[in-house]
Amino acid sequence: MKILAIKLLDYREWTERLGYDREWLIQKIQNKFMMKIHEIASQYNTFPLQLRFDNFLMIADGITTTQLAYMINDMQENLPVRIKSCLGYGKTPLEAQWNASICLNNQDDNEIKEYTDEKIAALHFDINFNTETLKYTSVYDSFIEITNIYVNLSRFLYKIGGILQYLGGDNYLGFISTESVNKVIEEFSDDNKIKVGIGIGKNARTAIRLATTSLEKIRNNREKTWHMEEE
């Protein structure tokens, strides 16, 4: 699988130049440029895992090296600092991002090598009855629960070579290799708290769309805890 790691250079120095009354401005600018990055990524059928804001990952399967080069250039034009990127390859998203991260920290120029494309398995997780619990708990306690679930899901996916992004509300987006799909099904087939829509596609955007389609079918069915759609 292919993962593009992207690092914003001199990001801390840029934030410090904004003065002491800067946190609101940093959040405003971060959200503004991430909105633009999501827009650019969608045009190339990928999806950014924004993670730390100053470092993020993109699923790159199904995208040519030429397209990646154009995408990186488009992102650079919309960011307040220079960026550095490197493409990593591995049997799983976790391994691919490790290799991309090592490459990112050990080479001077943006590097895009040719790697084999693999199908992508996207996972759209949703917590059952979480919206209802807001009637009986505080906003902050609900956030703590959401965070704890995120940690537990992250640990599970890490064990099987996957990566995870919190989407907001009670939704999470994961990526795994297609070989690990059965492990996810086994883990959540009897779970009455979490449902997972699984999508398998040739690129990240397609896989995510299919995962969301699967999740909607689970919600409509109300009997299953998982469903899978494949391109």
From Swiss-Prot:
Pfam short name (any one): GCH_III
InterPro entries according to UniProt: GTP_CycHdrlase_3 (IPR007839), Nucleotide_cyclase (IPR029787), Rev_trsase/Diguanyl_cyclase (IPR043128)
Protein's GO biological process: biosynthetic process
EC number(s) reported in the record: 3.5.4.29
Keywords: GTP-binding, Hydrolase, Nucleotide-binding
Function: Catalyzes the formation of 2-amino-5-formylamino-6-ribofuranosylamino-4(3H)-pyrimidinone ribonucleotide monophosphate and inorganic phosphate from GTP. Also has an independent pyrophosphate phosphohydrolase activity.
Full protein name: GTP cyclohydrolase III
Organism: Saccharolobus solfataricus (strain ATCC 35092 / DSM 1617 / JCM 11322 / P2)
